Amino acid sequence: MRVQSLLRAQSLATSSLRCSARSVARAPSRCALSTIAASRTPYTNGSKTDTWIEGQKIQNQRRWQTTAAKVLEQAKDDPSTLTQEKIVENLDPVEWERLSRVRNIGIAAHIDSGKTTATERVLFYTGRINAIHEVRGKDAVGAKMDSMDLEREKGITIQSAATFCDWVKKNDEGKEEKYHINLIDTPGHIDFTIEVERALRVLDGAVMILCAVSGVQSQTITVDRQMRRYNIPRISFVNKMDRMGANPWKAVEQINQKLRIPAAALQVPIGREDGFLGVVDLVRMKAIYNEGPKGEIIRETDEIPADIVELCKEKRQELIEKLADVDDEIAEIFLDEKEPTIAQIKAAIRRATISLKFTPVMMGSALADKSVQPMLDAVCDYLPNPSEVENMALDKKRAEAPVKLVSYNSLPFVGLAFKLEESSFGQLTYIRVYQGTLRKGMNVFNARSDKKIRIPKIVRMHSNDMEEIPEIGAGEICAVFGVDCASGDTFTDGNLAYTMTSMFVPEPVISLSIKPKHTKDTPNFSKAMSRFTREDPTFRVHTDAESQETIISGMGELHLDIYVERMRREYRVECETGQPQVAYRETMTQRVNFDHTLKKQSGGSGDYARVVGWMEPAESLGENKFEQQISGGTISEKFLFACEKGFMASTAKGPLLGHRVLGTSMVINDGATHAVDSSEMAFKNATQQAFRKAFKAGAPQVLEPLMKTTITAPNEFQGSVVGLLNKRNAVINDTEIGPEDFTVYADCSLNSMFGFSSQLRASTQGKGEFSMEFSHYSPAPPQLQRELVAKYEKEQAAKNA
């Protein structure tokens, strides 16, 4: 009953109706408190009445603070029994009024699906910007959310950009409701996947955009996986309905089949391709058209075009049947052969979407300024507000026991730094406030470093513009200046020892050496490296111990090229780069026993350590495992710890190529010590020597990264594309042939894909495109392995000569 009341309150959104809905569960209702207070007042004098009402407000505030404190205790002591419904039920009515109208959303999709174009329309229709500008900066301005010159030149989003806007929508009774939307536009290219990861980590919902022609593409599948990782409810928006070959029903089917999430269309297009005019809302059975120079005027009518009336009835029935599969209330109505009301359908869509059982599918064309406003209405109707989303933390005072975060302003502050960015005013740290209030001038504590930090300035970001604010409440997103931290750090006000889990960070797959062309640029080069590694966890920098070269690592060629270009533009540092290097790995395939003794004596105390045991492949490639099975104390604990350090040092740089070792296990079950000559260093060195010998005797292998590659090109170039893949010994997993284009899905070794982009363009007259993402490590071909090992041994011999 409580959930129904909340949903009814959400959809009707008038304070009188919310009061009546909540009075079922609790009396007196929140909204009636001031009315009750006024009716009880014994005074007729105005000033005395005001004083009495003010006193009642203070009493009510204390009561809500007491309730909030009890909820906080339950969140710590027994989080599993604290439901989101109970959290909402005990919200201060003023807080409920604010939070119920907040939406934290991201826009994510495959590259070139129209994310930034759609975001530009959202900002225009909400009044956040006064004019629409297109991607690639064709009008010398460029889209608002692409603030970097590189983004506007290349027509791609490189960094996620945050903004906020207010959307006024009409409810079913025709009354206006204002919603506050915090919006993050994310990149589509796989090389910048960390930007999507950290955006989704702090958001409550998302709009997943699909191309009406291509449907579900490779990066769509990656985005879906990321949304599932963080339990993000999503609305699907089939964009580019005005393109030749647009087929929204194929996209809906692919969401169901490829992404394996129940989906149904909430709209039917009125016309397609050049004749796309608008959509029919299947919930309310109304035709919706965009009018005006930029589609800013919405015209609704009950007159549905005659040629699609039957299709609309059919698709509405499909929607109800799909909802009956995922929602009990609609299932009952469906089994009783009754027709659900509009309110029941909307409530069911909302329940199923928030519980991750369903995704509603909208349709439109952002570039043609059509059907973006109904998508905004759907964000407000079907995606959750912050109080409806479960967020967990770990309590360090209770052995990192899980605790639930409660989105009340009155509780102790907890926030997560999810993105760092350098600005002209210094380091900018983006923070999602999960609990409590963040105020200008307050002190916060970094849970990782235990450092106390004062917040000098709080701003709301609008791409690269900012608006200063004095404070920000639970459920909101902001940015602060002057905070020294790392991406993923948790902040509290010091009253709670909470820490939040950070976002998933994939491992880099490609490296190259880099140095400034001119020695005088070294200070700026170092500054750039320091800044980029702080901002981007997937961009790694290290110095090779032998060559003393600076090595940068990242997610792909484009990823590293962008940083090299940014150094030139932002720091005026011209760089020389070496050939890209693949991040190979090493492993062993057979068990090998070892009995190794390190013995050095040169007068005085020497070195002595004996280690006995075996090495073998670990259960999975994802781990290296050290284990001791010593009995009788033949090796003391401190020496065993030194053995483990020796093992970890050995896995960091393998014997074959000097790359990391994966999937290897070492067990030490015996050994010997000397009363004078044994030391921790001796046992560490002995373990490393034993590791090298055993590893080389255990049929070692070089592992190379395989990339999940997706190539799309016009049908007439299919033979050329397949030929390119065959030359690279790619394994073709699937091929989809459409009316005009085909798509090939293949596994390719990263080593073979250098320079593929230019060859693909040449073979397809510039019409082909491809994307890659890391799939898994696989044994390298024997010939390649021999070449790599021989090259490494030759380099080592030259260095030691």
UniProtKB/Swiss-Prot annotation:
The protein's annotated pathway: Protein biosynthesis; polypeptide chain elongation
Domain of life the protein comes from: Eukaryota
Signal peptide: none
InterPro entries according to UniProt: EFG_II, EFG_III, EFG_III/V, EFG_IV, EFG_V, EFG_V-like, EFTu-like_2, G_TR_CS
GO CC term, one of those recorded: mitochondrion
Gene3D superfamilies named among the record's database cross-references: 3.30.230.10, 3.30.70.240, Elongation Factor G (Translational Gtpase), domain 3, P-loop containing nucleotide triphosphate hydrolases, Translation factors
Record: residues binding GTP: 109-116, 185-189, 239-242
Main location: mitochondrion
One Gene Ontology molecular-function label: translation elongation factor activity
PROSITE patterns: G_TR_1, G_TR_2
Residues covered by the tr-type G domain: 100-387
Protein known as: Elongation factor G, mitochondrial
Species of the source: Pyrenophora tritici-repentis (strain Pt-1C-BFP)
